[in-house]
Amino acid sequence: MSRRNFKVLYISGEVSPFVRTSALADFMASFPQALEEEGFEARIMMPKYGAINDRKFRLHDVLRLSDIEVPLKEKTDLLNVKVTALPSSKIQTYFLYNEKYFKRNGLFTDTPVQGELKALAEKVAFFNVGVLETLQRLGWRPDIIHCHDWYASLVPLLLKTVYRDHEFFRGIKTAMTIHNVYRQGVLPFKVLKKLLPDEVCSELHRSGDDVNMLYTGVEHADMLTTTSPSYAEEITGEAGNAFGLSEVLGERNMTLHGIVNGIDTRQWNPSTDKLIKKRYAPERMEGKTENKRALLEEIKLSPDTDRPVVGVIINFDEFQGAGLIAGSLKKLAAMDIQLVICGSGDQKYEKQFREFADAHPETVSLHTDCPDSFIHLAIAGFDILLMPGKIESCGMLQMFAMSYGTIPVAFAGGGIVETIDDYSEKDGYGFIFHDYTPKALVARLGAAVALYHDSERWKEIVGRAMARDFGWKHSAEEYGGLYRELLES
C-alpha cells in the first residue's frame, strides 16, 4: 500500500477554532494538516457542543448522515452529523450531534459538578459508539483510527469486541495519544454497564465501583504516543509520574512513543497574522510594540509600554499551575511588571485572581473568556509568557510565544525542556526554573525582567527565539513512519 492511500481518522473532544480548553485543541487544529502534507488522507470527528456556532464555522447538515442509530445496551439513540472543513484546509471535520447529550455548552470533563457523572458516562458511551456507527454510514474506511485522550478511549476496545467481526472494520488499527495523563475519565461502572455490552464491560479497567477510561484505552490501543520523549520517560520511569498508570504504561513501553508537538506556522506567524493589530517580523519589530499598546488599551491597563507585560494562559487547576501563581501573587505584585492572567476553571482560583486584579487595577488584568482573536493579540502583546504548569506533556503556547518574540519563563516539566533552551549570555531563548516553588518562579521571572531592561541583550534573545523553526514537518515525518510500521505489523 502506498502511503498516499493511507487514511487516518482523528477523534478528539476539542478542536480549535471550534472549541478550545487546552493545548489538545491547538494540536488537533494543525497536526492532521501536517499529516496530509506527508501524503495521508485525514479526517476528524468530534462532538457538536451547543457552544459551537454553526454559522460562524459554516457547519452544514449531511442528509445521508441523519438519524444514525447508536445501539447502546438498553436503548438505541439517534445522532445527526454536521460537517465543515478545518479552517485553512480541506480536512473534513464531522460533528456528531444529539440534543440530549450535546445541546448544553459543557464539554467533556473528568471533574464534573456533583451529580453529573451519570450524564458524563452516557455522553462518552454515546459518542464512542456513535463514531463507529457514523463511519459505517459514511462509507469512509480509515486504515487507522487515532484517538486523543480519554474521551475517545472506548474506540479501541469496541473494535476488539462488539465490532470485531464486522467486515467494514476488519484490519483497522488504533493509535492513542496521551496529552494529559492526569485527566483519566473516572466514571461509574454501574452506569456504563447499562450502556455497553457485557463483552465490553468485562474488559473495562475497574477500580472498585469506577472505571478508568484512559487506562482502558491504553490497554487496548495498538499504538501509544505522547507529546514529547521527556514526558514519555516521566510517565513510565521509576518516579511513576502517571497518576496510577505507571504500571500499564511501563508494560506497554515498547509501543509508547514520545514525539514533540509542532505548530501551524501559517496560522501562528506574526508577519501574516490577521488577528493582531500590526504584523511584524524580526527585522521590523516596531509592530510588536504596537500590539503591546493595543493589548494594554483593550484590557484597560496602564499604557506604559516600557514595563514588561507578563502573561499567564492556563486552566485554573493545580496541574496547570494555578496554585503556584496564587502562592506567588504578593511577590508578583512587588515586581515592576504588568500581569495578565487568562483562563478559567476552579472557582477558588478565579475568585483569588479576581480579587488580586481588583486590588491592582493599574497593573493586573484577569480574563476568563479568551477567544482565539484575544489569544493571538495577547501572544503578540506580551513580552514574557509565564508557564507555571507542574505537568506539561509538551505544550504549544511556548512555541507560539517564541515565534512572536515573546520569551517564556517555564517550569522544567515534560516537553518544556525539549522546546526551550535556558538562557545564557551566548545562547538560549527562554528561562526555566527547576524547583516548583513561588521563590524559584519569581527568581527566574526576575532574571527575565532584568534582561528585558537591557535592550541590546533582550533584542538578542528575542531574535534567537524568533529564529527557531517550530513547524510540524519533522514530527509529522516521525508519525508517518510510526503509522506505516503499525499498518505493517
Swiss-Prot record:
Its EC number is 2.4.1.21. It catalyses: [(1->4)-alpha-D-glucosyl](n) + ADP-alpha-D-glucose = [(1->4)-alpha-D-glucosyl](n+1) + ADP + H(+). Keywords: Glycogen biosynthesis, Glycosyltransferase, Transferase. Pfam families: Glyco_transf_5 (PF08323), Glycos_transf_1 (PF00534). It is an enzyme of class 2 (transferase). The keyword Glycosyltransferase applies. One of its GO terms (molecular function) is alpha-1,4-glucan glucosyltransferase (ADP-glucose donor) activity. InterPro entries: Glyco_trans_1 (IPR001296), GS/SS (IPR011835), Starch_synth_cat_dom (IPR013534). ADP-alpha-D-glucose binds at R20. GO terms for biological process: glycogen biosynthetic process. Pathway: Glycan biosynthesis; glycogen biosynthesis. HAMAP family: Glycogen_synth (MF_00484). Belongs to the glycosyltransferase 1 family. Bacterial/plant glycogen synthase subfamily. Synthesizes alpha-1,4-glucan chains using ADP-glucose. This is Glycogen synthase. It comes from Chlorobium phaeovibrioides (strain DSM 265 / 1930). The gene is glgA.
